[in-house]
Amino acid sequence: GIPVSVGGGNGMCESVGAGVAQDGAYYMSLDTAAWIAGQSKEPFFDPQRRLGHICTLDGRSFSVFGAMRCAGKCVNWAQKLFEVGSPRAFDAAASNIPAGADGLIFLPYLEGERSPVYDEQAQGVFFGMTQQHRREHFLRAVLEGVGCGLSQILDVLRERGEILDLRIIGGGAKSKVWKQIIADLCEVRLHDVTTLSDSAATLGAAAAAGVGIGLFD
């Protein structure tokens, strides 16, 4: 018959696919939602509910993480709302606006939020609007708003120790403009993984299957 191996959830498999296998290593998943996660020998209990933890795929350690409900979902929403033809056109428009979007700020809470403040009722906001703001400003503000949310998560994770480098996976990792915005806001170096950025979870699941059939340890 066909051998069946026990796998894991999306976050468990993505950690393996991103190559995060040692204590203190971190990665960022930038997709419809987003999170930053790092491996830890011990579980992390946060009474303020800013972070969570799950077991790693091998069950030997833990993945400590903070997550945003809407990341790429905000970009997709803005792309439709402002009738932007493609992700490439979105990036081109946003890159023509200076950092800070001339004072226009976006809060990316289109479906509530998880980290660092868990609030099901949180709502998205554009504020600081003036007559000088054009469509391009709103697009830039969306990218920066998500970046600021990720920076808040990283600030909490840094209470556990210094974080200077992050591997990045997910569909959002294809955007050079967005990655630069996030790197600047989070003050980190972002490293693309060698596998396809949006296939990390699949790679992790394949690794679990390989271990299950004895292909490798």
Where are these regions (language model features)?
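Active-site core segments that coordinate phosphate-bearing ligands/cofactors
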Residues: 1-169, 173-217
